[in-house]
UniProtKB/Swiss-Prot annotation:
Biological or metabolic pathway of the protein: Porphyrin-containing compound metabolism; protoporphyrin-IX biosynthesis; 5-aminolevulinate from L-glutamyl-tRNA(Glu): step 1/2
Biological processes annotated in GO: protoporphyrinogen IX biosynthetic process from glutamate
Note: During catalysis, the active site Cys acts as a nucleophile attacking the alpha-carbonyl group of tRNA-bound glutamate with the formation of a thioester intermediate between enzyme and glutamate, and the concomitant release of tRNA(Glu). The thioester intermediate is finally reduced by direct hydride transfer from NADPH, to form the product GSA.
Domain notes: Possesses an unusual extended V-shaped dimeric structure with each monomer consisting of three distinct domains arranged along a curved 'spinal' alpha-helix. The N-terminal catalytic domain specifically recognizes the glutamate moiety of the substrate. The second domain is the NADPH-binding domain, and the third C-terminal domain is responsible for dimerization.
Organism of this sequence: Legionella pneumophila (strain Corby)
PANTHER family to which the protein is assigned, alphabetical: GLUTAMYL-TRNA REDUCTASE
Protein name in the entry: Glutamyl-tRNA reductase
Length: 424
């Protein structure tokens, strides 16, 4: 098994490239199936967020991943290769550990990425594209990333893209309490935005979603009016703040729509934050006066501020990554001995049960228990050591001193000899 992590993120690709390869929920099953149709790919999972699209798979031919990604999204392979990274084996595990721990996020230490990776893994398991090879790798990564976050404290005082959005609103508006907020989308990011805004004193929400039931749940939790996506033009003029975080493939808020809303607001300022990838709001909306439009890339400069306390934690987390990586390598190597250990233990258990049943029959027949137990002990020792004894004699006859040293190590005879000498 060769673990490979391949993809692009906010560090390697601008938003106009990331949105072209972003995985839409409706496409997830078909893309995973298409990926597994490649004869070179044995197992795979795909993670897609606003800041990254990554493929985790078992393959000996990682170069096919870039070709597949370009073909599926109708992009030039030459163009995509400028932004793509491929990490194999140990480096692939290290990269995935860094992602799961929040070390590779735009906002260092943000906790959402681990949940998103778990969801991607669980979906791939349900679809059958993750099986016996990748399953233990992901499970180890999830356990290790939890240890890293706990020990380093990198997840203390949780911060996310959603929280950064709320902080940005606070810089532009002095009073949260007077704001009317139009929240478009009802997923995890939208829920976090609503939660943080509510904690800061916002009580006037308009909540629109393609799934009305999800919008109603948000409205019940934080208060507000539930709308459908089709209601956006009618209610947009009422919003001081518009935050959009849907999974729509194309923008649905354009310049003319916002311009019309401004006219009805008597050109009172509007703050629009597009947290979606692909974008929900056309970029030329920012050309309008009294409109402040930001997308996820615009949050980068703000995110850097106030992260100093996390940078120290990140340094410690990086050290823990190396330690966990060493642990993973040892654990993965140990898997090669798993079948041998199981077979050996089963063999020893069978021998022990045979001798135990023989001894119990003799005791039931009235023989002296002490004599039976002495015989049981001697016979068990002889049977357990019979094959190893024959093997040791053979390697001694063959003058294989290296194998004799290995036997001493396995049977720990040096330690026992030292113990005997100490006692005598």
């Amino acid at each position: 098994m060769v673990f490979v992590a391949c993809g692009l993120n906010h560090k390697t690709a601008p938003i106009h490239v990331r949105e072209k390869v972003a995985l839409q929920p409706a496409m997830q099953d078909s893309l995973l199936s298409s990926l597994l149709d490649l004869p070179e790919v044995n197992e795979a999972a795909i993670l897609s967020t606003c800041n990254r699209t990554e493929i985790y798979c078992d393959t000996n031919t990682p170069e096919v991943l870039g070709n597949w990604l370009a073909h599926e999204h109708q992009l030039s392979e030459e163009l995509l290769s400028q932004f793509l990274y491929i990490h194999q084996g140990k480096e692939g595990i290290k990269h995935t550990l860094r992602v799961a721990s929040g070390l590779d996020s735009m906002m260092i230490g943000e906790p959402q990425i681990l949940g998103q990776m778990k969801q991607a893994y669980q979906h791939a398991c349900r679809l059958g594209t993750v099986k016996t090879q990748l399953r233990p790798v992901f499970e180890y990564i999830f356990r290790a990333s939890k240890r890293i976050r706990t020990r380093s404290g990198i997840g203390a005082n949780p911060v996310s893209i959603a929280y950064a959005a709320v902080q940005l609103i606070g810089q532009l508006f002095k009073n949260y309490h007077s704001l009317s907020v139009f929240l478009i989308g009802s997923g995890e990011t939208a829920s976090l935005v609503a939660k943080y805004l509510h904690q800061h004193g916002v009580h006037r929400f308009l909540i629109a979603s393609r799934t009305l039931e999800n919008a109603q749940k948000l409205a019940e939790t934080f208060g507000g009016k539930t709308l459908s996506i089709g209601d956006i033009p009618q209610y947009l003029p009422l919003a001081d703040v518009v935050i959009s975080a849907t999974a729509c493939p194309l923008p649905f808020i354009n310049k003319s729509l916002v311009e019309h809303a401004l006219e009805q607001r008597n050109h009172a300022p509007m703050f629009l934050l597009d947290l979606a990838v692909p974008r929900d709001i056309e970029g030329n909306v920012n050309e309008l006066e009294q409109v402040h439009l930001y997308n996820v890339d615009d949050l980068q400069s703000m995110i850097e501020k106030g992260m100093n306390e996390r940078r120290n934690a990140a340094l410690q987390a990086e050290q823990l990554i190396e330690s966990e990586l060493d642990n993973y390598i040892r654990w993965h190597r140990s898997l090669r001995a798993k079948d041998v250990i199981c077979d050996y233990r089963n063999q020893m258990h069978t021998l022990a049960q045979q001798e135990l049943q023989r001894a119990l029959k003799k005791i039931s027949a009235g023989q002296n228990q002490q004599d039976v137990l002495n015989e049981f002990s001697m016979r068990l020792v002889n049977k357990l050591t019979h094959n190893p004894t024959i093997g040791l004699r053979q390697i001694a006859w063959d003058n294989r001193e290296d194998l004799l040293d290995l036997a001493r190590y396995l049977f720990d005879t040096t330690a026992n000899q030292s113990l005997y000498e100490e006692i005598s």
